[in-house]
Amino acid sequence: MNTYTDHDYTYSDAEFAEMWQLLAETNGRDGRPFNWTFSRLENWRFASWDRSPEEFRGMAHLWRDGVGRLAGFTITEHLDIGDDLELQTRPDCRDVEGEMLEWLERRYAGERPELTVTCFTDDDRRAGVLRSRGFREARPIGNFRAYDVTRRRLPVPLPGGYRLSDLSEFADVAAYARLEAVAFNNEYCDERWYRGKSLSPHYDPRLHVIVLSPDGEPVSVAHGWLEEQFCTAEIDPVCTHPDHRRKHLAEAAITEAFNRLSARGGRVAWIVSGAEPNPSNRLYERLEPTGLWTAHRWAKAV
């Protein structure tokens, strides 16, 4: 049986590199996002331009195996009390998950009314550990789809006056940030947010595909991320301005992003959506995924 020790996250570059490698390797070898995607971790670290090192230190916790290698970590995406507490583990260290949950229960006792953890519907091992500790399955929260990007796709025709571009060509980042702010109703998405995000190690503005309106404004986006070690990718975010929806703009942007990822050696790309009945699921099914996994939220009062 493996033995583990837990450690505070110190916000060091070396720790971040270990966390990134664990995610890229576990997801890349299986071809499915068992853990967070590498791009989600990069966004967590770099897009939160106003988050202090002290705040970051309180959002993750590490576990190491008997030889000091990173076995897994817990992480939360936001500082909100109701945000999910995620378990990220190496496949050969799944037995650490009980210790992780025990630590989370101690850490947040009296601070949160309940703990929420995500678990894929086909992950019987984690579900068993959660049940044994008194968690209950609450509801589905998201769908994860995989796509074969080695398959060349025909471009999706755009309405008259609209055209494809990317953020290596379109320089008005404030205008781009307004697109996401409006589409997601999130005023945090501004120029400072974008400039932080663009410092991510695997940010490539040529993969940040956008659609420009006849007036030259960005109105849709499919942002591709690619890591070259395992040739895995993610498209995140995907959105369209409310005034320009139902024109197949997002489908055109995603298709272009797929083809650009393929040209750079991408093998598989993942897109995450809200759970049903989120309307985005219809678009993502039309794109013919090769795999679909649903994540559920589990909860326990503490």
Question: What are the functions of these language-model segments?
Answer:
Residues 254, 277-280, 301-302:
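Short glycine/proline-centered loop/turn elements that form peptide/ligand docking sites
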